[in-house]
Amino acid sequence: MSEHPRDTPQFYLTAPSPCPYLPGREERKVFTHLVGDKAASLNDVLTQGGFRRSQSIAYRPACEGCKACVSVRICVDDFTPGRSFRRVQADNSDLIGQIKPATPTSEQYALFRSYVTGRHGTGGMADMSVLDYAMMVEDTHVHTRLVEYRKRGPDSRIIPRGTGDLMAVALTDVLTDGLSMVYSFYNPQVHDRSLGTFLILDHITRARQMGLPYVYLGYWVQGSRKMDYKRRYLPQERLTPHGWERVEK
Protein backbone atom coordinates (compact mmCIF):
# COMPACT_ATOMS: atom_id res chain seq x y z
CA MET A 1 0.00 0.00 0.00
CA SER A 2 1.40 3.37 -1.01
CA GLU A 3 1.86 6.10 1.56
CA HIS A 4 1.32 9.81 1.03
CA PRO A 5 3.21 12.61 2.78
CA ARG A 6 1.20 13.94 5.71
CA ASP A 7 0.93 17.40 4.17
CA THR A 8 -0.27 16.12 0.76
CA PRO A 9 -4.03 16.71 0.49
CA GLN A 10 -6.20 13.66 -0.14
CA PHE A 11 -9.48 14.17 -1.97
CA TYR A 12 -12.69 12.22 -1.46
CA LEU A 13 -16.08 12.05 -3.18
CA THR A 14 -19.36 12.08 -1.29
CA ALA A 15 -22.28 9.81 -2.05
CA PRO A 16 -25.21 11.36 -3.95
CA SER A 17 -27.70 13.34 -1.86
CA PRO A 18 -30.66 15.64 -2.65
CA CYS A 19 -29.59 19.01 -4.06
CA PRO A 20 -30.46 21.83 -1.63
CA TYR A 21 -30.81 24.37 -4.45
CA LEU A 22 -32.49 22.70 -7.44
CA PRO A 23 -35.52 20.45 -6.83
CA GLY A 24 -35.29 16.96 -8.24
CA ARG A 25 -31.51 17.05 -8.61
CA GLU A 26 -28.80 15.20 -6.73
CA GLU A 27 -25.50 16.63 -5.58
CA ARG A 28 -22.06 15.18 -4.99
CA LYS A 29 -19.04 16.94 -3.59
CA VAL A 30 -15.31 16.42 -3.73
CA PHE A 31 -13.61 17.42 -0.49
CA THR A 32 -10.37 17.44 1.43
CA HIS A 33 -9.26 18.29 4.96
CA LEU A 34 -7.67 21.63 5.83
CA VAL A 35 -5.29 20.76 8.64
CA GLY A 36 -1.66 21.26 9.51
CA ASP A 37 0.82 24.02 8.87
CA LYS A 38 -0.11 24.36 5.20
CA ALA A 39 -3.87 24.61 5.73
CA ALA A 40 -3.99 28.36 5.04
CA SER A 41 -1.98 28.18 1.82
CA LEU A 42 -4.02 25.19 0.66
CA ASN A 43 -7.23 27.07 1.41
CA ASP A 44 -5.96 29.95 -0.73
CA VAL A 45 -5.22 27.69 -3.69
CA LEU A 46 -8.45 25.72 -3.41
CA THR A 47 -10.63 28.82 -3.02
CA GLN A 48 -9.05 30.24 -6.16
CA GLY A 49 -9.96 26.93 -7.82
CA GLY A 50 -13.62 27.06 -6.85
CA PHE A 51 -13.66 25.35 -3.45
CA ARG A 52 -15.49 26.57 -0.35
CA ARG A 53 -14.57 26.05 3.28
CA SER A 54 -16.84 24.55 5.93
CA GLN A 55 -15.04 24.08 9.25
CA SER A 56 -11.84 22.14 8.47
CA ILE A 57 -13.19 20.86 5.14
CA ALA A 58 -12.74 22.37 1.67
CA TYR A 59 -15.29 21.18 -0.88
CA ARG A 60 -16.67 21.87 -4.33
CA PRO A 61 -19.57 20.42 -6.33
CA ALA A 62 -18.84 17.35 -8.45
CA CYS A 63 -22.32 16.60 -9.75
CA GLU A 64 -22.78 14.37 -12.78
CA GLY A 65 -24.43 16.16 -15.69
CA CYS A 66 -24.87 19.49 -13.87
CA LYS A 67 -22.69 22.60 -13.84
CA ALA A 68 -25.21 25.00 -12.28
CA CYS A 69 -22.94 25.96 -9.35
CA VAL A 70 -20.53 28.67 -10.47
CA SER A 71 -17.91 30.24 -8.19
CA VAL A 72 -18.24 34.03 -8.03
CA ARG A 73 -15.84 36.70 -6.83
CA ILE A 74 -16.40 40.47 -6.88
CA CYS A 75 -13.76 42.66 -8.53
CA VAL A 76 -13.19 45.08 -5.65
CA ASP A 77 -11.17 47.82 -7.36
CA ASP A 78 -13.67 48.32 -10.17
CA PHE A 79 -16.85 47.99 -8.12
CA THR A 80 -18.96 51.13 -7.93
CA PRO A 81 -22.23 50.90 -5.98
CA GLY A 82 -25.33 51.87 -7.91
CA ARG A 83 -28.29 53.78 -6.52
CA SER A 84 -29.90 50.83 -4.72
CA PHE A 85 -26.60 49.82 -3.13
CA ARG A 86 -25.91 53.39 -2.01
CA ARG A 87 -29.35 53.48 -0.42
CA VAL A 88 -28.52 50.33 1.56
CA GLN A 89 -25.24 51.88 2.69
CA ALA A 90 -27.08 55.03 3.80
CA ASP A 91 -29.76 53.03 5.64
CA ASN A 92 -27.02 51.26 7.61
CA SER A 93 -24.66 54.17 8.15
CA ASP A 94 -25.48 53.97 11.87
CA LEU A 95 -23.92 50.49 12.07
CA ILE A 96 -20.27 49.70 12.66
CA GLY A 97 -18.50 46.38 12.21
CA GLN A 98 -15.90 45.28 14.73
CA ILE A 99 -13.41 42.51 13.93
CA LYS A 100 -13.40 39.68 16.46
CA PRO A 101 -11.46 36.42 16.74
CA ALA A 102 -13.22 33.25 15.57
CA THR A 103 -14.67 32.62 19.01
CA PRO A 104 -18.38 31.81 19.43
CA THR A 105 -20.55 33.59 22.00
CA SER A 106 -24.03 32.99 23.38
CA GLU A 107 -25.14 36.33 21.92
CA GLN A 108 -24.04 35.25 18.45
CA TYR A 109 -25.80 31.91 18.79
CA ALA A 110 -29.07 33.57 19.85
CA LEU A 111 -28.95 35.74 16.72
CA PHE A 112 -27.98 32.73 14.59
CA ARG A 113 -30.96 30.75 15.91
CA SER A 114 -33.31 33.62 15.16
CA TYR A 115 -31.89 33.93 11.64
CA VAL A 116 -32.00 30.26 10.63
CA THR A 117 -35.45 29.78 12.13
CA GLY A 118 -36.79 32.79 10.26
CA ARG A 119 -35.01 32.09 6.98
CA HIS A 120 -34.67 28.31 6.74
CA GLY A 121 -37.59 26.95 8.78
CA THR A 122 -36.84 23.39 9.83
CA GLY A 123 -34.08 20.92 8.99
CA GLY A 124 -30.50 21.51 7.97
CA MET A 125 -28.99 24.52 9.70
CA ALA A 126 -32.17 25.10 11.70
CA ASP A 127 -31.29 21.96 13.69
CA MET A 128 -27.82 23.17 14.68
CA SER A 129 -27.13 23.10 18.41
CA VAL A 130 -24.94 25.55 20.27
CA LEU A 131 -22.11 23.02 19.95
CA ASP A 132 -22.68 22.78 16.19
CA TYR A 133 -22.50 26.56 15.95
CA ALA A 134 -19.32 26.65 18.00
CA MET A 135 -17.73 24.11 15.66
CA MET A 136 -18.76 26.13 12.60
CA VAL A 137 -16.96 29.18 13.99
CA GLU A 138 -13.86 27.84 15.71
CA ASP A 139 -13.04 24.63 13.81
CA THR A 140 -10.64 26.38 11.45
CA HIS A 141 -6.94 26.06 10.69
CA VAL A 142 -6.83 29.10 8.40
CA HIS A 143 -7.00 32.88 8.92
CA THR A 144 -10.64 33.21 10.01
CA ARG A 145 -12.32 36.07 11.80
CA LEU A 146 -15.75 37.36 12.75
CA VAL A 147 -17.15 40.80 12.08
CA GLU A 148 -19.87 41.84 14.54
CA TYR A 149 -22.19 44.69 13.58
CA ARG A 150 -23.88 46.98 16.10
CA LYS A 151 -25.15 50.54 16.15
CA ARG A 152 -22.43 53.16 16.44
CA GLY A 153 -21.60 54.39 19.91
CA PRO A 154 -21.02 58.06 20.76
CA ASP A 155 -17.25 57.55 20.63
CA SER A 156 -17.15 55.34 17.52
CA ARG A 157 -15.20 57.97 15.57
CA ILE A 158 -12.38 57.58 18.07
CA ILE A 159 -12.80 53.94 19.09
CA PRO A 160 -14.31 51.76 16.33
CA ARG A 161 -16.91 49.93 18.35
CA GLY A 162 -20.66 49.75 18.53
CA THR A 163 -23.22 49.58 21.30
CA GLY A 164 -26.56 47.93 21.79
CA ASP A 165 -27.90 44.69 20.38
CA LEU A 166 -25.96 42.55 17.93
CA MET A 167 -27.47 43.16 14.48
CA ALA A 168 -25.38 40.96 12.18
CA VAL A 169 -22.34 38.69 12.06
CA ALA A 170 -20.05 37.66 9.19
CA LEU A 171 -17.70 34.68 9.40
CA THR A 172 -14.87 35.48 6.98
CA ASP A 173 -11.60 33.96 5.80
CA VAL A 174 -8.74 36.29 4.93
CA LEU A 175 -6.94 35.03 1.80
CA THR A 176 -3.86 36.34 0.03
CA ASP A 177 -6.05 37.76 -2.74
CA GLY A 178 -9.32 38.56 -1.02
CA LEU A 179 -11.94 38.03 1.65
CA SER A 180 -14.03 34.87 1.48
CA MET A 181 -17.45 35.24 3.10
CA VAL A 182 -17.98 31.83 4.66
CA TYR A 183 -21.32 32.48 6.36
CA SER A 184 -23.34 35.51 7.43
CA PHE A 185 -26.45 35.95 9.54
CA TYR A 186 -28.44 38.87 10.85
CA ASN A 187 -31.62 39.97 12.61
CA PRO A 188 -34.41 38.62 10.38
CA GLN A 189 -36.97 41.00 11.89
CA VAL A 190 -35.25 44.07 10.43
CA HIS A 191 -36.47 44.02 6.83
CA ASP A 192 -35.91 47.62 5.78
CA ARG A 193 -32.12 47.57 6.22
CA SER A 194 -31.26 44.83 3.66
CA LEU A 195 -28.59 43.62 6.06
CA GLY A 196 -27.41 40.76 3.84
CA THR A 197 -26.64 43.22 1.06
CA PHE A 198 -24.97 45.60 3.51
CA LEU A 199 -22.60 42.91 4.79
CA ILE A 200 -21.36 42.23 1.26
CA LEU A 201 -20.93 45.93 0.53
CA ASP A 202 -19.04 46.37 3.79
CA HIS A 203 -16.72 43.50 2.91
CA ILE A 204 -16.01 45.09 -0.46
CA THR A 205 -14.96 48.23 1.41
CA ARG A 206 -12.83 46.22 3.84
CA ALA A 207 -11.11 44.31 1.03
CA ARG A 208 -10.33 47.57 -0.76
CA GLN A 209 -8.86 49.05 2.42
CA MET A 210 -6.70 45.94 2.84
CA GLY A 211 -5.46 46.10 -0.75
CA LEU A 212 -7.16 42.81 -1.65
CA PRO A 213 -8.63 42.49 -5.16
CA TYR A 214 -11.56 40.14 -4.54
CA VAL A 215 -14.49 39.27 -2.30
CA TYR A 216 -15.45 35.61 -2.73
CA LEU A 217 -19.20 34.97 -2.45
CA GLY A 218 -19.27 31.22 -3.00
CA TYR A 219 -21.58 29.75 -5.62
CA TRP A 220 -24.09 31.41 -7.86
CA VAL A 221 -26.52 28.60 -8.75
CA GLN A 222 -28.20 29.12 -12.09
CA GLY A 223 -31.91 28.44 -11.66
CA SER A 224 -31.94 29.02 -7.89
CA ARG A 225 -33.81 32.17 -6.87
CA LYS A 226 -32.22 32.32 -3.42
CA MET A 227 -28.73 32.40 -4.96
CA ASP A 228 -29.56 34.84 -7.74
CA TYR A 229 -28.58 37.90 -5.65
CA LYS A 230 -24.90 37.13 -6.25
CA ARG A 231 -25.22 38.23 -9.87
CA ARG A 232 -25.87 41.84 -8.80
CA TYR A 233 -22.34 42.69 -7.67
CA LEU A 234 -20.59 43.79 -10.85
CA PRO A 235 -18.03 43.61 -12.21
CA GLN A 236 -17.38 40.09 -11.04
CA GLU A 237 -15.49 37.03 -12.18
CA ARG A 238 -17.05 33.59 -12.60
CA LEU A 239 -15.04 30.40 -12.69
CA THR A 240 -15.39 28.44 -15.93
CA PRO A 241 -13.56 25.38 -17.30
CA HIS A 242 -11.24 27.92 -18.98
CA GLY A 243 -10.49 29.85 -15.79
CA TRP A 244 -11.96 33.00 -14.24
CA GLU A 245 -13.95 35.07 -16.73
CA ARG A 246 -14.96 38.66 -16.09
CA VAL A 247 -18.64 39.64 -16.24
CA GLU A 248 -19.51 43.32 -16.59
CA LYS A 249 -23.30 43.18 -16.82
UniProtKB/Swiss-Prot annotation:
EC id: 2.3.2.29
Pfam families: ATE_C, ATE_N
Main localization category: cytoplasm
BP-aspect Gene Ontology terms: ubiquitin-dependent protein catabolic process via the N-end rule pathway
Top-rank taxon: Bacteria
A GO CC term assigned to this protein in UniProt: cytoplasm
Keyword set, alphabetical order: Acyltransferase, Cytoplasm, Transferase
Enzyme class: transferase
Record field: catalytic activity: N-terminal L-glutamyl-[protein] + L-leucyl-tRNA(Leu) = N-terminal L-leucyl-L-glutamyl-[protein] + tRNA(Leu) + H(+); N-terminal L-aspartyl-[protein] + L-leucyl-tRNA(Leu) = N-terminal L-leucyl-L-aspartyl-[protein] + tRNA(Leu) + H(+)
Alphabetized InterPro entries for the sequence: Acyl_CoA_acyltransferase, Asp_Glu_LeuTrfase, N-end_Aminoacyl_Trfase, N-end_Aminoacyl_Trfase_C, N-end_Aminoacyl_Trfase_N
Molecular function via GO: arginyl-tRNA--protein transferase activity; leucyl-tRNA--protein transferase activity
Subcellular location: Cytoplasm
Family: Belongs to the R-transferase family. Bpt subfamily.
Functional note: Functions in the N-end rule pathway of protein degradation where it conjugates Leu from its aminoacyl-tRNA to the N-termini of proteins containing an N-terminal aspartate or glutamate.
Name of the protein described by the UniProt record: Aspartate/glutamate leucyltransferase
Classification lineage: Bacteria, Pseudomonadati, Pseudomonadota, Alphaproteobacteria, Hyphomicrobiales
